[in-house]
Amino acid sequence: MSLKRPLSEVDPEIFRAIELETQRQRNTLELIASENVASRAVMEAQGSVLTNKYAEGYPGRRYYGGCEFVDIAEDLAISRAKELFGAGFANVQPHSGAQANTAVYFALLNPGDTIMGMDLAHGGHLTHGSPVNISGRYFKFTFYGVEKETGRINYEKMFSIAFEHKPRMIVAGASAYPRAIDFYKIKEIAAEVGAYLMVDMAHIAGLVAAGLHMSPVPYADVVTTTTHKTLRGPRGGLILCKDAERYGTKINRAVFPGVQGGPLMHVIAAKAVAFKEAMEPGFKEYQRKIVSNARALADALLERGFELVSGGTDNHLILVDLRSKKITGREAQELFDAVGVTVNKNAVPFDPQPPNIASGIRIGTPAVTSRGLNEDDMVQIAEIMDYAIEHRDDRGKLEKARAKVDEICARYPLY
């Protein structure tokens, strides 16, 4: 067996799967709000020899020899993350956002403590207390949500819930909330009831880095995020805080040896590259285009009779309630897949359907904006979506919709 043989020879089945996925990404419009297109530089770092190196511990304090060069990569990732977000502390080792959240819970709380998070059915996340997740099994959760009439967080009601339940931690952030979140107000609520504030900014980290959304770092005790999504890095997690002296050691110990063993040094190097890219002038303009594209897409959908939760968007994400179109989220996801538009079915607040069917879809603009699509293209995408739903039973017309998607993809090649 030779270590130098190419993948196509060693494992043609996996090579074929990668080729097929590459073609899928090239030939479809990616509207899943949590997905993006990593740069060649990020992928080069992630596919480097750093994948060979075990490095349990932290820079300068490893349990293995030969870590002097991976220490350089991790130190760069830490310093860049701190600079990018104005933080006093950063841990770049979490393998995912879920593990970042879990580490924070175990760093600051004891099993059985009460946490208040956003209801999954209203746009929260599994790791914010779902009973099927470790968070909901080890801690007692109470939930806040959105108003039925507005689709927005009611901060006064949020305070009432916090005052009643006296949580030890409040978790802010969401996976399907299209509006700006006021972290200052939530910090006031947390302070009033004596709770820690943890902000999960996984979806909006890129917008925060670009100054297009209020940063939670000055207000939260701890901030977690993924490093992909709007940040456009590798799939991974990150923990930040302002007060390194108060929280740094606790967080480091909770990550390693608490919930993880060896860090993924190739992924950490890719994170460092992504943080550097996010500090370049063009990144802020890219984030502006994400938001302007999302608003253009939202407006175009509204004009075509789609109902949007909260009536629009302030960020990269749109939550579409499809009940007025007489189609479920699952049916729409399958329909749009057929014409080359990738979305995910998603529950809407107060959804009568079960999650595996759902009444809505969640869409977003990070990936299509990375490809270069503009506001005019968003109008065309809305037209395609509306046309596909209207003619969902007409194969010939669905083929026409697919052809329009092919035209757009040809104008904006992937890589």
Curated annotation (Swiss-Prot):
<dbReference type="InterPro" id="IPR015422">
    <property type="entry name" value="PyrdxlP-dep_Trfase_small"/>
</dbReference>
<dbReference type="Pfam" id="PF00464">
    <property type="entry name" value="SHMT"/>
</dbReference>
<dbReference type="InterPro" id="IPR039429">
    <property type="entry name" value="SHMT-like_dom"/>
</dbReference>
<feature type="binding site">
    <location>
        <position position="120"/>
    </location>
    <ligand>
        <name>(6S)-5,6,7,8-tetrahydrofolate</name>
    </ligand>
</feature>
<dbReference type="InterPro" id="IPR015421">
    <property type="entry name" value="PyrdxlP-dep_Trfase_major"/>
</dbReference>
<dbReference type="GO" id="GO:0030170">
    <property type="term" value="F:pyridoxal phosphate binding"/>
</dbReference>
<keyword id="KW-0963">Cytoplasm</keyword>
<feature type="site" description="Plays an important role in substrate specificity">
    <location>
        <position position="228"/>
    </location>
</feature>
<comment type="subunit">
    <text>Homodimer.</text>
</comment>
<keyword id="KW-0554">One-carbon metabolism</keyword>
<dbReference type="InterPro" id="IPR019798">
    <property type="entry name" value="Ser_HO-MeTrfase_PLP_BS"/>
</dbReference>
<comment type="similarity">
    <text>Belongs to the SHMT family.</text>
</comment>
<dbReference type="InterPro" id="IPR015424">
    <property type="entry name" value="PyrdxlP-dep_Trfase"/>
</dbReference>
<comment type="pathway">
    <text>One-carbon metabolism; tetrahydrofolate interconversion.</text>
</comment>
<dbReference type="GO" id="GO:0004372">
    <property type="term" value="F:glycine hydroxymethyltransferase activity"/>
</dbReference>
<feature type="modified residue" description="N6-(pyridoxal phosphate)lysine">
    <location>
        <position position="229"/>
    </location>
</feature>
<comment type="pathway">
    <text>Amino-acid biosynthesis; glycine biosynthesis; glycine from L-serine: step 1/1.</text>
</comment>
<dbReference type="GO" id="GO:0005829">
    <property type="term" value="C:cytosol"/>
</dbReference>
<keyword id="KW-0808">Transferase</keyword>
<dbReference type="GO" id="GO:0035999">
    <property type="term" value="P:tetrahydrofolate interconversion"/>
</dbReference>
<keyword id="KW-0028">Amino-acid biosynthesis</keyword>
<dbReference type="GO" id="GO:0019264">
    <property type="term" value="P:glycine biosynthetic process from serine"/>
</dbReference>
<dbReference type="InterPro" id="IPR049943">
    <property type="entry name" value="Ser_HO-MeTrfase-like"/>
</dbReference>
<feature type="binding site">
    <location>
        <begin position="124"/>
        <end position="126"/>
    </location>
    <ligand>
        <name>(6S)-5,6,7,8-tetrahydrofolate</name>
    </ligand>
</feature>
<protein>
    <recommendedName>
        <fullName>Serine hydroxymethyltransferase</fullName>
        <ecNumber>2.1.2.1</ecNumber>
    </recommendedName>
</protein>
<comment type="function">
    <text>Catalyzes the reversible interconversion of serine and glycine with tetrahydrofolate (THF) serving as the one-carbon carrier. This reaction serves as the major source of one-carbon groups required for the biosynthesis of purines, thymidylate, methionine, and other important biomolecules. Also exhibits THF-independent aldolase activity toward beta-hydroxyamino acids, producing glycine and aldehydes, via a retro-aldol mechanism.</text>
</comment>
<keyword id="KW-0663">Pyridoxal phosphate</keyword>
<dbReference type="InterPro" id="IPR001085">
    <property type="entry name" value="Ser_HO-MeTrfase"/>
</dbReference>
